[in-house]
């Protein structure tokens, strides 16, 4: 699973999910992609699950780019612990995704195979997503 090697701070504020993505909202590497339609947190486990589904479906045929990285730690207190006594310890890593952000990109496969792989991958994500294709290449 993905996680940063080193961070400036151990614990982060939760923050708010406002607005749409301005950067990372266009295809940059591949012909096809998965675009988020809603904003949410995506865990490193969910990213790994989607990666495995896509790679297995492409069967060594294409290339996959992961455009998001879980760089924010989410803390949690142990079960049955009284309130107070500080913030909990880092539990897992998340990527903050805003609507319009490209999550994954695929290249080197046909349009049909890419659509099938993306359809399977979207089931693994906790947000609404859509299939995106670069129009200049999608006329095969």
Curated annotation (Swiss-Prot):
Pfam families: Ribosomal_L16. Keywords: Chloroplast, Plastid, Ribonucleoprotein, Ribosomal protein. GO terms for biological process: mitochondrial translation. InterPro entries: Ribosomal_uL16, Ribosomal_uL16_bact-type, Ribosomal_uL16_CS, Ribosomal_uL16_dom, Ribosomal_uL16_sf. Disulfide bonds: none annotated. The keyword Ribosomal protein applies. It is found in: Plastid, Chloroplast. Its main location: plastid. GO terms for cellular component: chloroplast; mitochondrial large ribosomal subunit. One of its GO terms (molecular function) is structural constituent of ribosome. Part of the 50S ribosomal subunit. Belongs to the universal ribosomal protein uL16 family. This is Large ribosomal subunit protein uL16c. It comes from Cyanidium caldarium. The gene is rpl16.
């Amino acid at each position: 699973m993905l996680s940063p090697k080193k961070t400036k701070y151990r614990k982060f504020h939760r923050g708010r999910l406002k607005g749409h993505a301005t950067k990372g909202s266009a295809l940059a590497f591949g012909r096809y992609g998965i675009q988020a339609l809603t904003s949410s947190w995506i865990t490193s486990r969910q990213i790994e699950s989607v990666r495995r589904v896509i790679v297995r479906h492409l069967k060594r045929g294409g290339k996959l780019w992961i455009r998001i990285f879980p760089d924010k730690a989410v803390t949690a207190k142990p079960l049955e612990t009284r309130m107070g006594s500080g913030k909990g310890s880092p539990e897992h890593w998340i990527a903050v995704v805003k609507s319009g952000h490209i999550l994954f990109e695929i290249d080197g496969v046909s349009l049909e195979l890419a659509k099938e792989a993306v359809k399977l991958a979207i089931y693994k994500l906790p947000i609404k997503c859509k299939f995106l294709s670069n129009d200049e290449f999608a006329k095969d």
